[in-house]
């Protein structure tokens, strides 16, 4: 409670702002990233699938991705219900706080091929610090799932 400055992600930021109403957001990292990278969002989460599993179960992967897409859309359209459910199954802030945070979470389902430019921009930033952070080089085409 005594920090002058902090870098906080959602839903922690909404929790802080609820407990300390005078708290101000000075810099929005998502907005700064968009300014630096021509409006592109940065990737926050990825689904990684073992190549052998994908070969054996392509329909399962396709159906799973469709469900992830549908779920992400539902969460954005129903933040209160999503917050209530999520608070029951995970150690998260209470629903009133979590429901305020959901619209700020930048939840979006983006297919791998379409996400590739944003993923590569993000990985290049990491590689500038140390190429070892990304395994020495950018992933090749096989890294990005293509629905068939």
Please name every model-derived segment.
Residues 54-129:
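Secondary-structure end/capping motifs
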Residues 120-148:
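Conserved C-terminal helix/tail region of periplasmic/extracytoplasmic solute-binding proteins
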Residues 27-29, 78, 111, 115, ...:
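Poly-acidic low-complexity segments
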Residues 2-4, 22, 96, 113, ...:
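A local structural motif
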Residues 49, 55-56, 104-111, 136, ...:
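Generic structural "secondary-structure junction" signal
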Residues 2-85:
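Pocket-lining segment of extracytoplasmic ligand-binding domains
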Residues 17-18, 39, 99, 135-137:
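A generic structural signal for short, solvent-exposed coil/turn residues
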Residues 14-15, 92, 142-143:
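Short secondary-structure capping/turn micro-motifs that flank functional sites
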